[in-house]
Swiss-Prot record:
Positions of the NR LBD domain: 353-588
Compartment list: Cytoplasm; Nucleus
Main location: cytoplasm
One Pfam family cited in the UniProt record for this chain: Hormone_recep
Protein name: Nuclear receptor subfamily 4 group A member 2
Motif (nuclear export sequence (NES2)) on chain: 561-570
CDD domains: NR_DBD_NGFI-B
PROSITE patterns in the cross-refs: NR_LBD, NUCLEAR_REC_DBD_1, NUCLEAR_REC_DBD_2
Described purpose of this protein according to its UniProt entry: Transcriptional regulator which may play a role in the differentiation and maintenance of meso-diencephalic dopaminergic (mdDA) neurons.
GO molecular function, one term: sequence-specific DNA binding
Protein source organism: Xenopus tropicalis
Gene: nr4a2
């Protein structure tokens, strides 16, 4: 049986079979030429095109930088190098070439040529040595597979017309470190043939030529030459490697308006962090008073927010946090509902904790005003037509009814002012009777809408300004003008509640305990000053507090006009005034 042998000449030192070029001739002889170390190529007589596979061996790149030549890539047919350093040869015999067929028939000459089994002797290169001392040389598992060449020859099938052409070159190139391991590809005349192990037994048709790449080749290619071309590898890396997540703050989160820390939602009307929310809540519930040790302009940020409690609380008010929204201890967990009545009146209730003064004033004002849904429009006329010679009795009686109906409501409001019920009983009556007409005008002007000509009274009755002319006389025109001026100042409910309280808590002639009244008045003034000074509107209007307090003398003038109207109606004697109005008139006359 003929034997095909490969004869080699002298090999340069350190050469290996991978650095030799094998060429098959028609005579059945093999010749080998050593290539230069710069271009190490393994030539096989398969086609005239080139099969390129990049190897991805990241561990080699670290230790091969000192070499001037490329390292040798061992094909799957080589056995593992002996570590003893001795030069030896290995003989591979009985290599059978199968599978060359055309339309299921094997040509005689091809069958005879490929049925020959020969002996090929390989001369291994010297064992590799590590350039780094102490680093062990690791061997790939493919060197231990001694039957890889045999399996390659038995499973490789190439269907092509004619004789086997010259072997093309297999180029083995070093891939950069980090290239992902993948199956190699074969290039035939500009086409790619994949050696992916997932497509077992796949056939590739190229210009009418079928190439079947079996599992052993794909396995060896995946083990020995794991890498795509650089273009495919870069695409694979871009598609598989996720980008690192950004470390920025979440988009659904903002910054605290007080200290600049992260704030997820709004608290008491302003987006603030949990720390500033709790600080503001505790301060309001305990009615705490702070003192600044500096010039009341301490910086308040995330790092220094705990240094000065006074400046921190003032900044909370400046950015717009509303103290009235904070629930007191008696309303905790009740969602703003009023506390229920005690089950048994005999049980003494525990003393209530200190409540914010301005919060109590706002609550008293809201409770004493009619709700929008309960307004009475039954007597409202948008364009009333009055005859000057009509009966005035009905309009005068309506005037008295509106005054008496408002009196009980305003008295109930005054009793809810913190500290008012603790005053002397005679002082309470004197303060209320002296300020009733002032409070009647002030509350009516704040509730009404002068632009539309609507007047909303304490009992919920809505009337047109023209409907009140016959009963109120010229006094109603002064009230409407005062209402327009009051609305132009854009007074919020907190400031108005303080102004209304100051209208009744003031110095009057004949007080039994004027000192206690003065102390209560100072508390309300300071509360109004703090609210106006550190409110957003107050900072832009430096004289805003003076304008608010200037409304109190105007109320005194309007009160005098009201007394004059009552006095005129008494003289007219068309309708006798109610006893309570008559007593009020006699007790409050300044002359």
């Amino acid at each position: 049986m003929p034997c095909v042998q490969a004869q080699y000449g002298s090999s340069p030192q350190g050469a290996s079979p991978a650095s030799q070029s094998y060429t098959y001739h028609s005579s059945g002889e093999y010749s080998s030429d050593f290539l230069t170390p710069e271009f190490v190529k393994f030539s096989m007589d398969l086609t005239n095109t080139e099969i390129t596979a990049t190897t991805s061996l990241p561990s080699f790149s670290t230790f091969m930088d000192n070499y001037n030549t490329s390292y040798d890539v061992k094909p799957p047919c080589l056995y593992q190098m002996p570590l003893s350093g001795q030069q030896s040869s290995v003989k591979v015999e009985d290599i059978q070439m199968h599978g060359y067929q055309q339309h299921g028939h094997l040509p005689p000459q091809s069958e005879e040529m490929m049925s020959h089994s020969g002996s090929v002797y390989y001369k291994p290169s010297s064992p590799p040595t590590s350039s780094t001392p102490g680093f062990p040389v690791q061997h790939s598992p493919m060197w231990d597979n001694h039957g890889s060449l045999h399996s390659f020859n038995q499973n490789y099938v190439a269907t092509r017309g004619g004789h086997v052409p010259r072997l093309s070159l297999f180029s083995f190139k070093q891939s950069p470190p980090g290239t992902p391991v993948s199956s190699c590809q074969m290039r035939f005349d500009g086409h790619h043939v994949s050696m992916n192990p997932e497509t077992s037994g796949a056939h590739h048709v190229i210009d009418g030529q079928t190439f079947a790449v079996p599992n052993p080749i794909r396995k060896q290619a995946s083990m020995g030459f794991p890498g795509l071309q650089l273009g495919h590898a870069s695409q694979l890396i871009d598609s598989q490697v996720p980008s690192p997540p950004s470390r920025g703050s979440p988009s659904n989160e903002g910054l605290c308006a007080v200290c600049g820390d992260n704030a997820a939602c709004q608290h008491y009307g302003v987006r603030t962090c949990e720390g500033c929310k709790g600080f503001f809540k505790r301060t309001v519930q305990k009615n705490a008073k702070y003192v600044c040790l500096a010039n009341k302009n301490c910086p308040v940020d995330k790092r220094r927010r705990n240094r000065c409690q006074y400046c921190r609380f003032q900044k909370c008010l400046v950015v717009g946090m509303v103290k009235e929204v904070v629930r007191t201890d008696s309303l905790k967990g009740r969602r703003g509902r009023l506390p229920s009545k005690p089950k048994s009146p005999q049980e003494p209730s525990p003393p209530s904790p200190p409540v914010s003064l301005i919060s109590a004033l706002v609550r008293a004002h809201v409770d004493s005003n009619p709700a929008v849904s309960s307004l009475d429009y039954s007597r409202f006329q948008a364009n009333p037509e009055y005859q000057m010679n009509g009966d005035d009795t009905q309009h005068i009686q309506q005037f008295y009814d509106l005054l008496t109906g408002s009196m009980e409501i305003i008295r109930g409001w005054a009793e809810k002012i913190p500290g008012f019920s603790e005053l002397h009983k005679q002082d309470q009556d004197l303060l209320f009777e002296s300020a009733f007409l002032e409070l009647f005008v002030l509350r009516l002007a704040y509730r009404s809408n002068p632009a539309e000509g609507k007047l909303i009274f304490c009992n919920g009755v809505v009337l047109n300004r023209l409907q009140c002319v016959r009963g109120f006389g010229e006094w109603i025109d002064s009230i409407v003008d005062f209402s327009s001026n009051l609305h132009s100042m854009n007074i919020d409910i907190s400031a108005f509640s303080c102004i209304a309280a100051l209208a009744v808590i003031t110095e009057r002639h004949g007080l039994k305990e004027p000192k206690r009244v003065e102390e209560l008045q100072n508390k309300i003034v300071n509360c109004l000053k703090d609210h106006v000074t550190f409110n957003n509107g107050g900072l832009n209007r430096p004289n805003y507090l003076s304008k608010l307090l200037g409304k109190l003398p105007e109320l005194r003038t309007l009160c005098t006009q009201g007394l004059q109207r009552i006095f005129y109606l008494k003289l007219e004697d068309l309708v006798p005034p109610p006893a309570i109005i008559d007593k009020l008139f006699l007790d409050t006359l300044p002359f």
